[in-house]
């Protein structure tokens, strides 16, 4: 039954899933995502959005948040929480010009509570702490420099990721162009964004959403374009992945992987992280048809009764991978060919300079946790702005929360490097362990956080560095370490060799068994333990790894081979077993 027939009870392929959730009512009654957002903007009594609009602003790229550090104190003073919004920009492939950067730097400085720019695992930037009177200004500022935030949140296709530094080869450039095409093709067609935020003309006549449908998707949907052997975008964290296949340096098509995703719910074993399934190879000319077919199949078959089981990964496990694949073939008018050979060998960013095929140079800057701010002794935000004032190329935000200064002519290299060093953007002493560690935002702004992540990680990494040194591991050795403040998985801990998932303040679930190239899900090793206990466990395990490992064996592979943790092969069967 089509998702757009709005039945009171959802039935898919003869299976009754149950009554539609209230989120489906909300979307159906929203007048194509307009709701009463405009009226809420005029309400100065509260700093927040009310009722359905609290959810609807997500489709416009925003989440309502507050400062949890001061929530209790404001409550004592009989004040409402300090409501504000976080905005996530739509930047397919993560490319931003120096002109655009200077504009977002200025807005962050003048109109946000925290003054920072946050690079994210979705290869874009976020503003945190934008108060209601500044929201419309924010959208209009972004629009004036060619940026929007349409569909970076909500039940739609989110920001499309692409392997970083697409000018490094002709293949990269072609793949980036496809990331942009896919993003545009799957974008909502409603005029609500322009009408509300950009004072666009209200055009009479019905809106139509030919791909997403009038109720949009059952849940968020994430898409990537990845260029092997580099898996920087973590394909298995995403619903739909196009793995670039090249011949003689030219892109000829994609292997299509469907059904990845990392979010879960503590205590609910019907939720689990899952690897994507390989559907097969398609030629380039079928890319947009296949993208639309996967999205529309999930639109019609995804669970609209239970949002915890609404993502594509659960649809595949419910109806069967082959059944889903056959429906995609039918809708796209193709037959998947056998997948072409490829291999992932790495996923971290190459910090420092690399030279492109065009003779220009690219400098990847390590930005710890993606937070660009002027820290004591490390004025990172000022430094990037100073580079933007003289840089002739562009910037590339990476899915590892770092920043690439791309397209630097040889004669500009010394000046760019000097600016980077003067502002703490280059640190020759940063360890491989720190470079390969990552956290989501969590406290104080994320309302879903159960434990610290971004503020916790730097000191925790220092402790892990000490453990590696204690066991005489070489300096270039590292463990893929990720921390996420809740089980929703923004920090992609469920593809790490060591993954920490927040359970309560100061407590985490410890997961082991992922691998370095991001193709294995880690399994829970210890539940609800403190950071001190986690470090004790890591110390013991690293000691064994240092003395027992095979030549070149990564930590995650060692934990599987040594029987410390069982391998997750089929998530539905193995993750909780």
UniProtKB/Swiss-Prot annotation:
Its cofactor is siroheme; [4Fe-4S] cluster. InterPro entries: CysI, NiRdtase/SiRdtase_haem-b_fer, Nit/Sulf_reduc_fer-like_dom_sf, NO2/SO3_Rdtase_4Fe4S_dom, NO2/SO3_Rdtase_4Fe4S_prot, NO2/SO3_Rdtase_4Fe4S_sf, NO2/SO3_Rdtase_FeS/sirohaem_BS. It is an enzyme of class 1 (oxidoreductase). GO terms for cellular component: sulfite reductase complex (NADPH). It holds the Pfam family NIR_SIR. It catalyses: hydrogen sulfide + 3 NADP(+) + 3 H2O = sulfite + 3 NADPH + 4 H(+). [4Fe-4S] cluster binds at residues 440, 446, 486, 490. Keywords: 4Fe-4S, Amino-acid biosynthesis, Cysteine biosynthesis, Heme, Iron, Iron-sulfur, Metal-binding, NADP, Oxidoreductase. The keyword Iron applies. Pathway: Sulfur metabolism; hydrogen sulfide biosynthesis; hydrogen sulfide from sulfite (NADPH route): step 1/1. Its EC number is 1.8.1.2. One of its GO terms (molecular function) is NADP binding. Siroheme binds at residue 490. One of its GO terms (biological process) is sulfate assimilation. Binds 1 siroheme per subunit. Alpha(8)-beta(8). The alpha component is a flavoprotein, the beta component is a hemoprotein. PANTHER family: SULFITE REDUCTASE [NADPH] SUBUNIT BETA (PTHR11493:SF47), SULFITE REDUCTASE [NADPH] SUBUNIT BETA-RELATED (PTHR11493). Component of the sulfite reductase complex that catalyzes the 6-electron reduction of sulfite to sulfide. This is one of several activities required for the biosynthesis of L-cysteine from sulfate. Belongs to the nitrite and sulfite reductase 4Fe-4S domain family. This is Sulfite reductase [NADPH] hemoprotein beta-component. The gene is cysI.
């Amino acid at each position: 039954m089509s998702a757009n027939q709005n039945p009171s009870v959802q039935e898919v392929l003869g299976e009754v899933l149950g009554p539609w959730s209230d989120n489906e009512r909300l979307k159906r009654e929203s007048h194509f995502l307009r709701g009463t957002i405009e009226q809420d903007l005029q309400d100065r009594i509260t700093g927040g959005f009310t009722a359905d609009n609290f959810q609807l602003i997500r489709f416009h790229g925003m989440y309502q948040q507050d400062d949890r550090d001061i929530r209790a104190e404001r409550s004592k003073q009989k004040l409402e929480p300090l409501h504000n919004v976080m905005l996530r920009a739509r930047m397919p492939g993560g490319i931003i010009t120096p002109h655009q950067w200077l504009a977002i730097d200025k807005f962050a400085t003048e109109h946000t509570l925290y003054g920072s720019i946050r690079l994210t695992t979705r290869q874009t930037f976020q503003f945190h702490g934008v108060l209601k009177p500044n929201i419309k200004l924010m959208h209009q500022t972004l629009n004036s420099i060619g940026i929007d935030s349409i569909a970076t949140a909500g039940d739609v296709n989110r920001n499309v990721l692409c392997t970083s530094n697409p000018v490094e080869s002709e293949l990269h450039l072609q793949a980036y162009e496809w990331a942009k095409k896919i993003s545009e093709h799957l974008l909502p067609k409603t005029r609500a964004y322009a009408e509300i935020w950009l004072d666009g003309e209200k055009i009479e006549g019905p809106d139509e959403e030919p791909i997403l449908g009038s109720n949009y998707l059952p849940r968020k949907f994430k898409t990537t374009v990845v260029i092997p052997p580099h898996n920087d975008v973590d394909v298995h964290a995403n619903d739909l992945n196009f793995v670039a296949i090249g011949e003689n340096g030219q892109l000829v098509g994609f292997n299509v992987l469907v059904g990845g995703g990392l979010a879960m719910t503590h205590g609910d074993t019907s939720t689990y992280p899952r690897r994507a399934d390989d559907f097969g190879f398609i030629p380039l000319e079928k890319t947009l048809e296949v993208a639309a077919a996967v999205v529309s199949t999930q639109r019609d078959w995804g669970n609209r009764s239970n949002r915890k089981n609404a993502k594509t990964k659960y649809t595949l496990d419910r109806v069967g991978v082959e059944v889903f694949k056959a429906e995609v073939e039918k809708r796209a008018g193709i037959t998947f060919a056998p997948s072409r050979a490829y291999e992932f060998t790495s996923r971290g960013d190459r910090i420092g300079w690399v030279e492109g095929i065009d003779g220009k140079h690219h400098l990847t800057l390590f930005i710890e946790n993606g937070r660009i701010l002027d820290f004591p002794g490390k004025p990172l935000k000022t430094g990037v702005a100073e580079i933007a004032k003289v840089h002739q190329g562009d910037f590339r935000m990476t899915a590892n929360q770092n920043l690439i200064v791309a397209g630097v002519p040889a004669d500009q290299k010394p000046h760019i490097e000097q600016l980077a060093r003067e502002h703490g953007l280059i640190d020759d002493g940063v360890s491989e362990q720190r470079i390969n560690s990552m956290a989501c935002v969590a406290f104080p702004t994320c309302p879903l956080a159960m434990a610290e992540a971004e503020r916790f990680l730097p000191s925790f990494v220092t402790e892990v560095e000490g453990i590696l040194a204690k066991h005489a591991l070489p300096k270039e050795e590292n463990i893929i370490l990720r921390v996420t403040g809740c089980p929703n998985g923004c920090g992609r801990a469920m593809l790490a060799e060591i993954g920490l998932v927040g359970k309560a303040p100061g407590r985490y679930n410890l997961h082991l068994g992922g691998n370095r190239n991001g193709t294995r899900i880690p399994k829970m090793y210890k539940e609800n333990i403190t950071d001190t206990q986690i470090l004790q466990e890591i110390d013991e395990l690293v000691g064994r790894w240092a003395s027992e490992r095979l030549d070149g064996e990564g930590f995650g592979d060692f934990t599987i081979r040594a029987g410390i943790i069982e391998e997750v092969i089929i998530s539905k069967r193995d993750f909780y077993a």
